[in-house]
Design a protein with these regions (language model features):
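Surface-exposed beta-loop interaction hotspot
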Residues: 16-28
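Small-residue helix/turn framework positions
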Residues: 2-15, 31-47, 52-54, 68-172
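Internal alpha/beta loop-helix hairpins
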Residues: 58-60
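Intrinsically disordered, low-complexity regions enriched in glycine and serine
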Residues: 63-64
């Protein structure tokens, strides 16, 4: 069973955004399969453009032969005039026993990310940082992982590698 939604617009104010992200504080054993497309997503007053998410559940064998649910992120995409972001990945149980923060529920998010920037200055302005960069194009790609749900970016456990290739811009 897949939860599907096609929306022309979705506007989540800051208070609503916090409520959405707090849903993952008591992390479920499985997330629903999703097929969501939003023509215009606004998050905390910031227009993020077109949003698409396709994700499903699967059973996967873990270390020691245990079978557990993994939430597969097949498509995560944001498209705006200045840039396009896409990612694939999974939210899966941590492979080995380790001392983990309580809020992570022994699950880890893994993402392969790709950001194509057409106008870095305009992109930074969109995210509230005007006057930092003029123009600039390029890409950022790599792998990221953190303890906890995809909606709970946990910076203390963040790991990964990113490649940045930017050109034709000027720091102001």
């Amino acid at each position: 069973l897949t939860l599907s939604a096609r929306l022309a617009m979705l506007n989540l104010a800051e208070a609503q955004t916090n409520d959405v992200f707090d849903l993952s504080s008591n992390q479920p054993k499985a997330m629903p399969a999703l097929d969501v497309a939003v023509d215009q997503l606004t998050l905390s007053g910031r227009d993020l453009g077109r949003f698409q998410l396709q994700a499903s559940n699967r059973l996967a064998r873990q270390e020691g032969g245990k079978v557990a649910n993994e939430w597969q992120i097949e498509v995560l995409r944001l498209d705006m005039a200045e840039a396009s972001f896409q990612a694939t990945g999974q939210w899966a149980p941590v492979a080995r026993k380790a001392k983990l923060p309580a809020e992570t529920a022994a699950r880890r998010t893994y993402l392969d990310v790709d950001l194509t920037v057409r106008d870095g200055g305009a992109l930074l302005t969109r995210f509230g940082m005007p006057g930092v960069l003029r123009a600039g194009s390029g890409s950022l790609s790599g792998q990221l992982a953190w303890l906890g749900a995809p909606t709970r970016f946990h910076t203390p456990s963040l790991s990964g590698a990113l490649n940045v290739d930017m050109q034709k811009g000027q720091f102001l």
